[in-house]
Amino acid sequence: QLLGQPNAVNAYIECCQRYVGKQKTALIWEGKNGESEQWSFEQLDVASAQLANYFKSIGIQVGDCIAGLLPRTPELLITILATWRIGAIYQPLFTAFESKAIEHRVLTANTKLIVTNAEQRPKLNHVEVKHILTVNAGTNLASNEADFWQEAKQQSDQCEAVLRSFDDDFLMMFTSGTTGLARSVPVPLKAVLAFKGYMQHAVDLREDDSFWNLADPGWAYGLYYGITGPLSLGHSIIMDERTFSVDHAVEVIKKYRVSNLTGSPTAFRMFFGFKEKFDPSIKTHLRAVSSAGEPLTPEVIHWFNNDLNVNIYDQYGQTEMGMVIANHHALDHEKKVGSAGFANPGHRFAVLDANYQEVKYGEIG
């Protein structure tokens, strides 16, 4: 269930405000230099209000696009929540993108503001955008640039969320662009309900889980199910700023006694390649593993099932529609190795012909 109604909903309310006052941790952050921080929903409420008020002060309107070119840091999450709070649309920019990929996405989406950091900032030197907000901007700022915290801390910590409808967009995604120019994929607010359903039925996210999604929030799986989905359930998320490595991933899994893990087959194949690093203590807390992106290999499945004593399940989705078919951890149905599973509750799938008519069993569509 969402707190909002079809004609009065806001993703910030669903993913933060509704949990303010419950004294729950929302974000666990592991910094690239060994720092660790924990942010409560109450702290994110204050920080996102201040940033949202700055957005309004520079003329950002309901329905405008704000892009985040940021690593996995607290500022990224604050930017997302502040964007949603004022009824604007958040656009992720993967930090490995070069300037041309950024420019194409920004121009296509008519993005009004890019939030970035000092490390990523040089990529924007030749990108046309009205406003740039930089974390640790320094002193040599462009005429259209401001410093993230310097501006945010000057603002009020009160900001009323703007209510929208289910069909209004709250994310501006793009396809991967592997077969040509990346195409825009606007995501409506009603998708939050589907994201919650996936977390509950397929991932089986429970209140007492320690949850970590390995995927980068610059892409759909990390943003939909590493941020939006779990936060909409009032569940804490782990953000790890470091570049992925098996050694560090094992450290995080052990440090936070991760019980519910999601990621890509690529990451899980890397785990299998260094399986000697997974000591028996991990068996005592790792309960469920979900994989998305491409099929798992039999040897990886066998290793998780038999050596780590945990079920790892294939699941399927796309940027354009989210995760829609899965072997569900929380549902009692047959799990067949090599199969993507069954449609998520609330979904039905069929093969169509060239005229978009459903074909019969055995026919090619």
Residue locations for each model-derived region?
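Conserved AMP-binding/adenylation subdomain of ANL enzymes
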Residues: 193-210, 217-260, 274-275
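Conserved pre-ATP/AMP-binding loop-to-beta segment of ANL
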Residues: 23-25, 134, 153-174, 181, ...
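Conserved AMP-binding A3 loop
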Residues: 37-42, 170-194
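Conserved AMP-binding/adenylate-forming core of the ANL superfamily
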Residues: 27-81, 98-103, 148-150, 187-190
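Structural core segment of the AMP-binding/adenylate-forming
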Residues: 57, 78-151
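Conserved beta-loop-beta connector loops within the AMP-binding
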Residues: 350-365
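Gly/Ser/Thr-rich phosphate-binding loop
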Residues: 258-262, 272-334, 348, 356
